[in-house]
A protein has these predicted regions:
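Sequence-structural signature of mature extracellular/luminal beta-sheet repeat domains
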Residues: 1-317
């Protein structure tokens, strides 16, 4: 099989030729989510806080401590969901929480499964019916694990939590996205181990949100695989993947850091290069849904694309 030359992938035809621009700097960025007013909420995991960046560039602390929040997303009602993890220091929540931005109400949706704590909830998405799907790997201290499984879970609208994917079907789940017709689930399966998975899977979903018919969309091996992921309105995947300077034996220079655009059929459509390590996640925003915000290292970057993002909230004009 011919080796893929990731570094030679062109900018997607709809991306700004100027590339990405820095929007703001913190310590270690993750989990961007954008509300209807254009405010960007993103995690600063090392400093244990969530930052709010207003459209005028004003930066403020939204929550501190954040209980090591990682991925975030909005539901159809404009409520902000948080994956409270366990990485980069003590005080991690190891749970899924939700904030009502209008009232300020903050609630715990789930913090245990079968009586034991989650590993480190990593990323989350909402389907068209309001159900939440989240991943629970362990990339940090594995001695804290109370369960042997690194799985994917669904929170139904009545609050019931079900584990829907686990080993051996998957290795280490990370980024996750569900189409707004609630029919397909995309999953990043990304292990830091040299022989671990660096795959993107797709599953069919039935009416109850149960996955089946697992297929491979793309495999980034032997390079660093993807982290966060989003979908656009055309159904294409936007994957925060790769590394510019490998950190350990499980990473190579085969996949340079950037946002990789992949069709639902697995075709590589382009790459938006990002020069800073470590690229982690992205979110769609802006009045028309065509601005993307990218978290990488200490920086929140922004650029423009032609196709709006596919999100539960807000709905683009």
């Amino acid at each position: 099989m011919e080796k893929t030359s990731y570094e030679k992938l062109p900018l997607p035809a709809d991306a700004e030729t100027a590339g990405v621009k820095a929007a703001t700097l913190v310590a270690f960025t993750e989990g961007p989510a954008v509300d209807a007013a254009g405010n960007v909420y993103f995690s600063d995991i090392i400093n244990n806080r969530i930052i709010k960046l207003s459209p005028d560039g004003t930066r403020s602390v939204f929550r501190e401590p954040s209980f090591r929040t990682n991925g975030q997303t909005f539901d159809q009602q404009g409520r902000l969901y948080h994956c409270e993890g366990s990485e980069f220091g003590p005080g991690g929540g190891r749970r899924i929480t939700r904030t009502n931005l209008e009232s300020g109400a903050y609630e715990v949706l789930t913090e245990r499964y079968d009586g034991v704590r989650y590993n480190s909830p990593n990323d989350i998405c909402i389907d068209g019916r309001g159900r939440a799907y989240f991943t629970d790997p362990c990339y940090g201290d594995r001695s804290i694990m109370e369960m042997e499984i690194e799985g994917v879970y669904r929170i139904d609208t009545d609050g019931t939590v079900r584990r829907i994917l686990a080993q051996p079907a998957i290795d280490r789940p990370n980024g996750i996205a569900v189409t707004q017709d609630s029919r397909r689930l995309y999953l990043v399966d990304s292990s830091p181990l040299k022989e671990g998975n660096r795959k993107i899977w797709v599953f069919d979903l039935d009416d109850d949100g149960n996955p089946s018919n697992q297929r491979l969309v793309h495999d980034f091996a032997p390079g660093r695989g993807a982290d966060g992921m989003r979908l656009d309105m055309a159904g294409n995947l936007y994957l925060a993947a790769g590394v510019n300077v490998p950190r350990h034996a499980g990473e190579t220079r085969d996949v340079p850091a950037g946002i990789y655009i992949v069709s639902p059929q697995g075709n590589l459509l382009g790459r938006i290069p990002v020069s800073e390590d470590l690229i982690t996640n992205l979110a769609f925003g802006g009045r028309d849904g065509r601005t993307i915000y990218i978290t990488a290292g200490k920086t929140l970057y922004t650029t423009r694309v032609a196709v709006p993002g596919q999100v539960a909230y807000p709905k683009w004009a």
